[in-house]
Design a protein with these regions (language model features):
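Surface-exposed repetitive/solenoidal architectures
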Residues: 1-229
Length: 229
């Protein structure tokens, strides 16, 4: 546990199957400029990295997570916190440089909203997954440009896309349709590679099903190197 001076828990770390297995390393990066806490999870020699902006705060994101006052995302470390509340609403406030570190995608099914504000995500290296593993229910993702992302796939992945591996709507308990949508999403010059990958892949979504909407989206100059897909 990492706590503040009042004894309030700021961060709880430990083995986490959703994040990749055993917690194997904790380190502080960029200590003199924009410090972040790096946590590495090891699962059969495959590592998942999580980053947290420093200093830690009880609630690191500005905003309230509502549609009227979404959480504000200004850096990669804050983007990773979407996993903490995957049904909340988020707004990207500026271009974000992910620094090229391997990122295994947000692990929890995303059912909230993310407005990219027409800003760009750069230096994104996706290890085995898109930005989101799952986009579900009434999730809405819009107004994002992703420049030259690289996605490395393995035989452990059955579906993969730069935005999400899978995307699906559904039904409420009363039978009301739930529609998941993406709009105004543009992926520029992606590289998708995986010699042992035998699933389905796409520049935006790997596999879409059941009440999914896409509008004004594009993928330009894609280099897809998955011969067995």
């Amino acid at each position: 546990l990492i706590c503040n001076n009042e004894g309030e828990t700021l961060l709880e770390l430990g083995a986490d199957a959703a994040k990749g297995g055993a917690l194997s390393m904790i380190n502080v990066l960029n200590e003199k400029t924009n410090p972040v806490l790096l946590c590495a999870y090891n699962n059969d020699s495959k590592f998942t990295l999580n980053f947290y902006a420093l200093p830690l705060q009880k609630n690191q994101l500005k905003g309230e997570g509502t549609l009227a006052a979404p959480y504000q995302i200004t850096c990669a470390a804050e983007f990773f916190q979407i996993d903490d509340q995957p049904s909340a609403h988020y707004q990207i406030m500026n271009d974000i440089d992910f620094g090229g570190a391997a990122f295994a995608g947000l692990q929890k099914a995303f059912a909230g909203s993310l407005d990219g504000g027409n800003y760009a995500l750069t230096n994104l290296f996706l290890n085995g997954s898109g930005l989101f593993r799952e986009v579900v229910d009434t999730a809405k993702i819009k107004n994002i440009t992703i420049k030259q992302p690289v996605m490395a796939l393995s035989d452990r992945t059955t579906a993969a896309g730069i935005i999400a591996n899978t995307m699906r709507g559904g039904f409420t308990d009363d039978g009301v349709e739930l529609h998941a949508t993406i709009s105004n999403i543009h992926v520029l010059s992606p590289i998708i590679a995986g010699n042992n990958f035998t699933g389905v892949c796409g520049g935006l979504i790997g596999e879409a099903s059941l009440f999914v909407g896409m509008s004004e989206c594009s993928v330009l100059d894609a280099d897809i190197q998955v011969l067995n897909a």
